[in-house]
Amino acid sequence: MDIYHVWCDIEGDITDKEWAHNLREFLKSLKEENKIESYRITRCKLGFRSIQDLPEWHIMVETKDMSQLETAFQRVAKVEQHTLDEIESQIKIKHHAFNQHVADNIQHALFRDWPDE
C-alpha cells in the first residue's frame, strides 16, 4: 500500500468542522469511485509537535499502488480542466469547498509499506 500524506493549515472564512466535513465528503467520493482505498483526517492535539512549523492538519490517503494514486490525481485534474459531466461537477464542488481554504504552507509526502510485499 502507498500512503499519500498531506499536512496543511486552513485559512479563510470557514470553521474547522465545516472544512473537515467538506474534505471528508470529497475523499468519500473518491473512495466510492474506488480511486482510493481509505483515508484519515487528523489534527494536531494540544499543539503538540516537535517539528517546527508543522501544519495543524494531517490527511492520509491510502492507495493500492502508484497506478491507483495516479488515477485519483487524474480524476481531480480532469475536474479542474472543466471537462465535466454531472458527477464530475459534484466532485469539483466538493474539491473546491475545502481546497480554497488550504493555506500556502501545505506539505506533501508519499510513503509505502515496508518491506515491499
Question: Model-found features: residue ranges?
Answer:
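Structural beta->alpha junctions
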Residues: I10-D13, T63-D65
